[in-house]
Amino acid sequence: MNYLSTRGGMAPQPFSDILLEGLAPDGGLAVPEQLPQVSAETLESWRGLPYADLAFEVLSRFATDIPADDLRGLTRAAYTSQIFNSEDIVPLRPLDNGLSLLGLSEGPTLAFKDMAMQFLGQVFEYVLTRRDTTLNIVGATSGDTGSAAEYALRGKRGVAVFMLSPHGRMSAFQRAQMYSLQDENIHNIAVRGVFDEAQDIVKALSLIHI
């Protein structure tokens, strides 16, 4: 599986290259050359799989440059009951009248963004280690995205996080989540202004090619 830019100015690249690039060089988003097809029989065979193994089955259609055994190990490391405080990872809680509630806030920061970020933390470390390189990630947040990213990437080899946030404009809970982390690869930067101004700084930095 290779990826192309939505703006058409990038040669096809595999998943691991796209992972480390962020935006495509032409400023577009990376999208699959084609969407994988999954048959009804395959979907039925996935029924009842543990969440980590289901995640592997889906991601293996997109991250085809990562060996299957390695990718399965990454999903199983990302989605554990110790991290998500639930054996089901995304527990389904029955309500009245045949309705159920799907829990997406069982992760370390209680935000649904933990679902994606925990896998990203594992796969970033995996790819960077095998390429013997490092990566600096600069982001802007008004709360839950920054927390989820920092908790997923804390302590990971080869990656450093620099997270900008608007000074005094996050909840006390979100500030405590982010600013209490003491990991050497996590750096919180409070920006005097609103979130958009913090995001503008990140966008300006992304235009600098060293």
Where do the language-model regions lie?
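Short coil/turn connectors at secondary-structure junctions
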Residues: D26, D96-G98, D132-L135, K156-V161, ...
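N-terminal entrance/gating region of PLP-dependent enzymes' catalytic architecture
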Residues: A30-L110
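Well-ordered mid-protein domain cores that form the structural environment of catalytic cofactors
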Residues: L99-G155
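Cofactor-binding loop segments of dinucleotide-utilizing enzymes, especially the Rossmann-like FAD-
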Residues: A140-S142, L164-P166, G193
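Conserved small/polar residues in nucleotide/adenosyl-binding loops
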Residues: I208-I210
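Accessory "access/gating" subregions that flank catalytic or transport cores
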Residues: A190-V194, D200-I201
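Charged, compositionally biased N-terminal leader segments and the immediate start
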Residues: M1-D26
